[in-house]
Amino acid sequence: MNNNLPTGSIAAAVDLLNKENVIAYPTEAVFGVGCDPDSETAVTRLLELKQRPVDKGLILIAASFEQLKPYIDDSILTTAQRKAVFDCWPGPVTFVFPASATTPRWLTGRFDSLAVRVTDHPLVVALCNAYGKPLVSTSANLSGLPPCRTVEEVRAQFGDDFPMVEGATGGRLNPSEIRDALTGELFRQG
């Protein structure tokens, strides 16, 4: 079965996500692979595909902060901390928040926190809005290989039949910056 999706085929991507599949899609700098954050089956598939240990934790990417609220606890953020986060969103900055009490370990790994981002990439915004929630999002690359930046690179690493929302990345050179929402500490330079 050929799972490639025509450019902008958001409805087909949502159908695949609802069936616990992992899909590829362009983000601000590189292609991402993602899935339903509420499906342990889908997340396990993603982790196996990436050869990534569950204890490392994952990133959620969303169209809006409202989509992220069920997964994080932002109640302890001060007004200044909240402003620092919202000044960067939507955009290519990922923030680590305390996880909500109900966020599953397959998302947080060994941590009591969760990395989240409100994207400004139009295809991902449309995908998350159509899906009605965030996606688990990690760079589209197999273990030991560089992240994919083009449709052709995704096909070369994952195969011609890997389900993908085709489109261009946002053109940034580096993956998203990662910061602590409470302290502002920089974990990864963007």
Curated annotation (Swiss-Prot):
The keyword Transferase applies. It comes from the Bacteria. Its EC number is 2.7.7.87. It catalyses: L-threonine + hydrogencarbonate + ATP = L-threonylcarbamoyladenylate + diphosphate + H2O. Keywords: ATP-binding, Cytoplasm, Nucleotide-binding, Nucleotidyltransferase, Transferase, tRNA processing. Belongs to the SUA5 family. TsaC subfamily. It comes from Salmonella arizonae (strain ATCC BAA-731 / CDC346-86 / RSK2980). This is Threonylcarbamoyl-AMP synthase. InterPro entries: DHBP_synth_RibB-like_a/b_dom, Sua5-like_dom, TC-AMP_synthase, TC-AMP_synthase_SUA5. Residues 7-190 form the YrdC-like domain. GO terms for cellular component: cytoplasm. PROSITE patterns: YRDC. Required for the formation of a threonylcarbamoyl group on adenosine at position 37 (t(6)A37) in tRNAs that read codons beginning with adenine. Catalyzes the conversion of L-threonine, HCO(3)(-)/CO(2) and ATP to give threonylcarbamoyl-AMP (TC-AMP) as the acyladenylate intermediate, with the release of diphosphate. Its main location: cytoplasm. GO terms for molecular function: ATP binding; double-stranded RNA binding; L-threonylcarbamoyladenylate synthase; tRNA binding. Pfam families: Sua5_yciO_yrdC. The gene is tsaC. GO terms for biological process: regulation of translational fidelity; tRNA threonylcarbamoyladenosine modification. It is found in: Cytoplasm.
